[in-house]
Amino acid sequence: TNYAFKKLTKNLDLNKNLKKNISLNQLFISKINKPKKVWSSWNFDSDNNKHKQHLGTLHSIKKKSYISLNNFIKLKKIKKVDFIKLDVDGHELDVLKSGDKFLKNNKPIIFIEIAPYLYPEFGYKCSKLITYIKKLKYSFYTEDLKKIIDIDSYVKKITNGGSENFYLMKSYKT
């Protein structure tokens, strides 16, 4: 959101050593979906126009701010990505699909928030997201880096309206 982006910009201005290594880009990473508005910016001071479950507020997306992850990496001539933080409130599957070529070939570590209650709103189930992540040859790990053997059973234990963070790392066959 614009609010979060302004805060990040201000923070970087205070950290000159970090600023020279970081390029800020306010974009909507997507392969297919191009919504005109998205739920974000949790405003705890107002009850107006909040999402019924996660309480985000609706914000407009600029028309020219859409790009796929594959195209962004190509456009910016990015050679190496070590880590991706993915917390996009239901758009996870679309973001991952938008970077399919890059993710299949490079396997950066991904820190992802999985919130099963959100996905039906976007036309898919959590099982579809998990299947796609496995297809990309990633394994699931807890926040304390313990490998999850049966992710399908694990996510079924996430309470309705809840979410959990996971690390995704390259799968190795033994």
Model regions: which residues?
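Phosphate/nucleotide-binding beta-alpha loop and adjacent structural elements of enzyme active sites
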Residues: 1-174
